[in-house]
Amino acid sequence: MKNIFFICFCALFAFSGCADDDDDLLTGGNVDIDLLPDAKPNDVVDPQVFEAINLNYPGLEKVKEFYEAGEHYYAANALLEYYRTRTNVTNPNLSLINVTISEAEQAKADYALVDYRFHVNNFYEDKETLKPYSVKQDGGINWEYSPKDASDEYQKQLHRHQWFIPQAKAYRVSGDEKYIQSWIEVYKNWIENNPKPTTGPNTTSWWQLQVSTRIGDQVQLLEYFKNSVNFTPEWLSTFLVEFAEQADFLVDYPYESGGNILISQANALATAGTLMPEFKNAEKWMNTGYQILSEEVQNQIMSDGWHKEMSLHYHIGIVADFYEAMKLAEANQLSSKLPSDFTEPLRKAAEVVMYFTYPNYFIKGSDNVVPMFNDSWSRTRNVLKNTNFKQYVEMFPDSEELKYMQTAGNGGTAQGRTPNNDMKLFDQAGYYVLRNGWTPASTVMILSNNKSNDASNSLSAYSHNQPDNGTFELYHNGRNFFPDSGVCTYYTSGGDNDLRYWFRGIDKHNTLSIGKQNIKKAAGKLLKSEEGATELVVFENQGYDNLKHRRAVFYVNKKFFVLVDEGIGNAEGTINLSFNLCEGTASEVVMDTDKNGVHTAFSNNNNIIVRTFANKAVTCSPFTGRIAYLVDGAYNTRQSYTIDMNKSADETARYITVILPVNGSTDTSSISAKFIDSGYSENSASVEVSVNGETHTLSYTL
């Protein structure tokens, strides 16, 4: 029998294709070229692997022969050799040629070797060194560990095993077996201590997003580690049985709330079925995944191009997921699994990212290049340039605008052409963009007036939507003067959510409220828009049962902004018009409380002055604001304030705010404004604004 196997094995070796790189067949392994390994009892191999694998799959003939002869260990050994030499699938997200590892990835790999310090995104025992928390307890691993005051996100991400891929890269680069030994020890421990729940998904280890992430990583881990002497037939059987169980779980439990998690789940299933076709259920995994992706690209991307969760962070993520699914299908001759019009919604979705990228993206070394509305945070220019826009150009090579974004970012040499400066209205999502150019010195105002939909219908603290309809960000000449407060932290069930609540507070955004109470409804409605020398957008939201906020924004000669805000309804109490400024010292961001406004005095002469006027007496109330650029519980302080008015039930609160960008000192700037209509009208408003001696009459009629 052994001699027959030797002849067959040599023939297979001679006629099989090349592995991913030349050393794949020359390193590692535990098979002597002349002999099979010493026999081991059947019970060292998980017998379920032979139930999960399709023994009739081409290339598994020896596996089937050994299995039917009752030689389970030799069958598993033949299966391992099959995986080491197979060339029947292609993972476009993985290359084993000249693998490199970053300093950050190396640190994650090494920290995991000592006291089980497992990397969990944005959670560190020492933020300076990015040292992870240790989950070691009584000599073992406590998979239920969560640092003090950490949000639910820690437990969720712990079970995504974010340090495994760095360890795999470290192994591939160094050849040091300690990395695979750590992986096997830890993953085996995880399997033993986190069995699949009998009742379906839980909120931590077996939540759909965690399972999806693990599946996506495991197809890579197999390739990185498979030639190690420590990757034994016994371990392969354990690994494959667990892989099949997790993929089957995703088929059985589609994420009911849809959104980005369902897309991640579908992508994982498509990946599992495509790259692991040897499993009996591979076709089911693949078909389920591609079917969901085909449906959800239409269901979740609205007609204006926005993803229904209306968070730019998740929007960018789902476009990347759809792109990866498309590339996976193409690389494995499975494009027919996706509809021919699969990319049509993705074009608009890619253009959303383009229009929501601030022009400092084109400055070499600049960060914080996108707005942070809802559960979203700033993104570095390198991620957009080297990953996202690169993918968009690959999908849409005919787009000269996307080509410009991909090439000109981070100080690059521009190709293609700049997008136009027209007002962009994303009415389905409730976002409106006003701009005067695409150079770093340009001005861009983005306004948020979201409306609920079937994927984003809650303003509860755990949702990705913040109760901030009417808010805005304003970028000018390299500086975001009114950045969103950010997220800071995710929700914690039954825990301390003070930071989560604070950053979601409506007065921590640039909009109107009553008594600083969060709105109850997100039902943004676009009422009017006009283009021309002076651009206009008018929108409203019935955020409370008895109070509606209407905001009209005039972009006067594309030089300065006039905001007309009205609190409409029979609500009575204190109306708060809130403004949250950029970071700066007290001498750089200066409150002008007596003038109901603020001005900046930055040394680079890039400044603004803000003044608010009203239809009755108001007071200016400064407070210490906050801004968070990540979701790690950390934040910086900044200057914020509210313009407060006491409103009776029969009154409409009316404000005029002028925001004037200034090149130099604001000392000589003069601003005044007043209403020139006869009072609140359901269909119109008219104001007179004087800026530096020049008077402008601004009005709209619905």
Curated annotation (Swiss-Prot):
Signal peptide start and end residues: 1-17
Enzyme class, broadest EC rank: lyase
UniProt xrefs under InterPro entries: Chondroitin_lyas, Hepar_II_III_C, Hepar_II_III_N, HepC
Subcellular location: Periplasm
Residues at the active site: 314 (proton acceptor)
E.C. designation(s): 4.2.2.8
UniProt entry tagged with the keyword Lyase: yes
Coiled-coil region: none
PANTHER family, A to Z: HEPARIN-SULFATE LYASE
Name recorded for this polypeptide: Heparin-sulfate lyase
Lineage: Bacteria, Pseudomonadati, Bacteroidota, Bacteroidia, Bacteroidales
